[in-house]
């Protein structure tokens, strides 16, 4: 069972506790909502947080988020918005009404895009009397390797850019970032405690799948 780990203080959470832990987010990498229904039933109360990405949202988004919320689950809507500031911000405002607990954008969209998104989302939540979802930024996609990085013409290292983008996201008011476990320590040192770090592709200790 692969998913993402969330850290707000230490580097990585302890995954030994079998009770539901909001620091473990299970990825719903499906096209069909029937697969979601089956997995949520199988995992029951042991998991409280699920990640819905493009694959599932584009095929069943209108059904899957309400289904999860109706089962008292938290939702990380992983759509990685990246557009001009107004478009990204308005897209996030529309997604807020889905009931997601975490939304995200690409940090490479820049400070203005992230700041506009934060301000617009908080203003709308206050106006509507709704809880504001956490807003986090993707630093560098974990699939990017050194060859890909060089092809982009980047002069700094991947780690240096991850830290730079994390600090930019924090300065824009973002709640945290998505980054690989390899960069978690450097981000924590640069951004301090209380800044959310979501690390994808982790498995809890003792997981059989």
PLM region descriptions:
Residues 35, 60, 112-116, 186-187:
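Phosphate- and divalent-cation-binding pockets in alpha/beta enzyme and binding domains
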Residues 51-102, 106:
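Metabolite-binding pocket within alpha/beta catalytic cores that recognizes anionic/polar moieties
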Residues 17-42, 46, 122:
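N-terminal glycine-rich anion-binding loop in soluble enzyme alpha/beta folds
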Residues 1-15:
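N-terminal amphipathic/basic-hydrophobic helices that include classical n-h-c signal peptides
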Residues 42-43, 68, 94-95, 169, ...:
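Generic structural signal for hydrophobic
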Residues 44-48, 72-73, 96-101, 173-175, ...:
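Glycine-enriched alpha-helix->loop->beta-strand junction motifs that scaffold or abut catalytic
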Residues 24-28, 50-52, 75-79, 105, ...:
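Hydrophobic faces of well-ordered beta-strands that scaffold small-molecule active sites
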Residues 21, 87-91, 98-172, 183, ...:
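Conserved anion-binding
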